[in-house]
Amino acid sequence: MGLFGLTRFIHEHKLVKPSIISTPPGVLTPVAVDVWNVMYTLLERLYPVGKRENLHGPSVTIHCLGVLLRLLTQRSYYPIFVLERCTDGPLSRGAKAIMSRAMNHDERGTSDLTRVLLSSNTSCSIKYNKTSETYDSVFRNSSTSCIPSEENKSQDMFLDGCPRQTDKTICLRDQNVCSLTSTMPSRGHPNHRLYHKLCASLIRWMGYAYVEAVDIEADEACANLFHTRTVALVYTTDTDLLFMGCDILLDAIPMFAPVVRCRDLLQYLGITYPEFLVAFVRCQTDLHTSDNLKSVQQVIQDTGLKVPHQMDTSTRSPTYDSWRHGEVFKSLTVATSGKTENGVSVSKYASNRSEVTVDASWALNLLPPSSSPLDNLERAFVEHIIAVVTPLTRGRLKLMKRVNIMQNTADPYMVINTLYHNLKGEKMARQYARIFKQFIPTPLPLNTVLTKYWN
């Protein structure tokens, strides 16, 4: 997930900065929350692998969600939750979709191109069907609803395919869920996963703003919220968001939350955003296999980038065959204050008002000519990223379509009903609901928060 080795790189080079509280009292900072990324991160922290035996799955899910909402409230963050698609159909956009189409290509009578993609000596090429991607195609409104019918709401919506456990549950007290002995045999440890539909239902009925990413990946929806100036940060540990030019919030637990800004990373590397796309697309884990995947540190060494901590050791590797045309990266080693080939100053990214992705389309001019299936995949992915992060030009206007944000009116009855069907006990459900009401205030309307923050 993300760029291989980028998380280690940003920590080793101290690119993770504590967030500075700059909003006045009463003004909330809107953040996009990659729900499943954050929830599973909390699951790993609250319930280490050795302590997950005999746990009640719904209680663990409710506990993690309660901790998340409490943290966001304490840090004055206003979350817009990005929910992953609930359908079983394939994704239509993104790295996984591009890779899937290439692997299923049947141009030469075979549907398995794994051998072709992994072979470095093959001369076979894949004809990727290029599409003119715009926000109308990438972020189109979907008619698919994640809310099941009324007759299935009491069963499928809350069970999420997992067997029910015993009703001996212990309520959430002091952010702890006690262990529970299950009377059913374990089948693949179902309690080691979160109950996705339960979590999504609680988010809806508690009145939080949310986005349903139906046929796109959640990180693309988060990037759209960031580049449309809807949110100030994206709460996730997925470094793909940095690749998409976003600023990410890694953890909401510390008082001064750690933040990584894309402009700081670009300024540290001394390159522009188009050069960043071209150089580090080889590090994308969803697009490459272990045989052709490169780490961030390997790309820095092979392309000759001179970061501040390696000014006297970084040299270009003559054996790096994937970058056959070295002249493409002449601009990668220029000083931070200098100009690049396309006349864009790297130093402009130091400004808080700068938009790092404004010249993203220049990356297509920096890409070397495609001569292998892997080159075609990388070009297709870069084209897709450009379509996600850049606006659509209409004459003198530049328009960027925002994903559809929904917000239901808070319904305490439906919250209790959702808890009741998962906990099989009205008393326990009301106890959970009372704790939510006591520690987590009802969310404000989305437009009110956005107006106060951005104005």
Curated annotation (Swiss-Prot):
Please list the GO biological process terms of this entry: symbiont-mediated degradation of host mRNA; symbiont-mediated suppression of host gene expression
Keywords, A to Z, come to: Decay of host mRNAs by virus, Endonuclease, Eukaryotic host gene expression shutoff by virus, Host gene expression shutoff by virus, Host mRNA suppression by virus, Host-virus interaction, Hydrolase, Nuclease, RNA-binding, Virion
Where does the secretion signal sit in this chain? Answer: none
| GO molecular function list | endonuclease activity; RNA binding
Show the disulfide pairing: none
- The question of whether Nucleus is a record keyword is answered with no
Q: Does the keyword NAD apply?
A: no
Q: Which SUPFAM superfamilies match?
A: PIN domain-like
The protein's Enzyme Commission number:
3.1.27.-
Q: Which Gene3D superfamilies match?
A: 5'-nuclease (3.40.50.1010)
Q: What does this protein do?
A: Minor structural protein that acts as an endoribonuclease during lytic infection. Degrades host mRNAs in the cytoplasm by cutting them at preferred sites, including some in regions of translation initiation.
Instruction: Report what the protein is called.
Output: Virion host shutoff protein
> Which species is this UniProt entry from?
Varicella-zoster virus (strain Dumas)
Tell me what gene encodes this: 17
